[in-house]
Regions:
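N-terminal small-residue-enriched
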Residues: 2-94
C-alpha cells in the first residue's frame, strides 16, 4: 500500500504541500498546532501542489513557509487545490 504524504511547513501556514498525487475524495491527516484534523480533498492534487488546510476568504493571504506567497482571488475551501486559478500575486507595481 502506497503511503501518501503532505507537509505543513510552518504552523501558521494555511496550505499543505502534496508529496504525492492525490484524487478528489481522498482523506489526508494533518497535524496542526490546534490538534490533528482530517481533510477531505475536493480536487485532484498533483505532486508539489498546495492544498488548503484552512478556509481562506477572497483577498486573504496564502501563507506557506510562514510567509505570504500570494492572496486568494476567490474563497478557497478546506481541501481545495490552491494554485494560479485561485491565487494572485500580492505585489504592487511601481
Amino acid at each position: 500500500m502506497e503511503v501518501k504524504r503532505t507537509v505543513l511547513v510552518h504552523e501558521s501556514d494555511n496550505v499543505l504541500t502534496a508529496f504525492s498525487d492525490f484524487s478528489a475524495g481522498e482523506i489526508v491527516s494533518v497535524q496542526l498546532d490546534t490538534g490533528d484534523i482530517e481533510v477531505e480533498l475536493l480536487d485532484d492534487i498533483a505532486f508539489g501542489h498546495k492544498i488548503a488546510v484552512r478556509s481562506i476568504e477572497a483577498g486573504s493571504p496564502i501563507v506557506k513557509y510562514g510567509c505570504t506567497i500570494g492572496k486568494a482571488t476567490q474563497e478557497i475551501k478546506i481541501g481545495q487545490w490552491v494554485h494560479t486559478h485561485n491565487v494572485g500575486d500580492d505585489y504592487q507595481e511601481n
